[in-house]
Amino acid sequence: MALNGAEVDDFSWEPPTEAETKVLQARRERQDRISRLMGDYLLRGYRMLGETCADCGTILLQDKQRKIYCVACQELDSDVDKDNPALNAQAALSQAREHQLASASELPLGSRPAPQPPVPRPEHCEGAAAGLKAAQGPPAPAVPPNTDVMACTQTALLQKLTWASAELGSSTSLETSIQLCGLIRACAEALRSLQQLQH
């Protein structure tokens, strides 16, 4: 399959760095805690809604008095979490940028590779969402983005978004629903970043 003239080498897979692995592990542990808490609330009579929290993307619950409840925002998140790169994508991106700047300053000018935006890795839904979040980092390209690549990427993201939305509608698994919500949010954020690049 031709990729609009792009080299296949441009899309080669690289294993996650130690920092990325720690971030993924922390996210996995956080999702597990959210799932356990949601299970406890469901056993207490709470209902799972077909909506997600606008702040964190977690599936919302409703108690018998019809009060809306977000397990992640109201039980897990705190001010400390906002600075934790394992729980906050912005903090993780900032830490990754600091690490890249520190490693780039150690290299002599002649041996410094040209900066390339990270490419999302096809992984489990949660990993794919994390890869998409990492791919939307703010470094502006030195040249205008290739419109063919942008269009191809936008089409792929829209297809993935449509697929995830359809799957979410038919999903009966709490864990799958949580992961699909994360994927939908990551696709939407990536599409927003693409639109910003085009303007």
Swiss-Prot record:
Keyword set, alphabetical order: Acetylation, Cell cycle, Cell division, Cytoplasm, Metal-binding, Mitosis, Phosphoprotein, Zinc
Top-level taxon: Eukaryota
Motif residue range(s): Nuclear export signal: 173-194
Binding-site positions, Zn(2+): C53, C56, C70, C73
A GO CC term attached to the entry: cytoplasm
Cofactor annotation comment: Binds 1 zinc ion per subunit.
Record-listed N-acetylalanine modification sites: A2
Stretches the record annotates as Disordered: 100-125
Effect of L191A: Ubiquitous intracellular location
Phosphoserine carried by residues: S94
Subcellular location as annotated: Cytoplasm
Effect recorded for L180A: Ubiquitous intracellular location
Cofactor field: Zn(2+)
Result of altering L197A: Ubiquitous intracellular location
One of the GO BP terms on file: mitotic cell cycle
One Gene Ontology term of the molecular function aspect: metal ion binding
Matching InterPro entries: SSSCA1, UPF0148_domain
Summary of the function given for this chain in its UniProt record: Might play a role in mitosis. Antigenic molecule. Could be a centromere-associated protein. May induce anti-centromere antibodies.
Binding partners and assembly: Homodimer.
Name of the protein this chain belongs to: Protein ZNRD2
Lineage: Eukaryota, Metazoa, Chordata, Craniata, Vertebrata
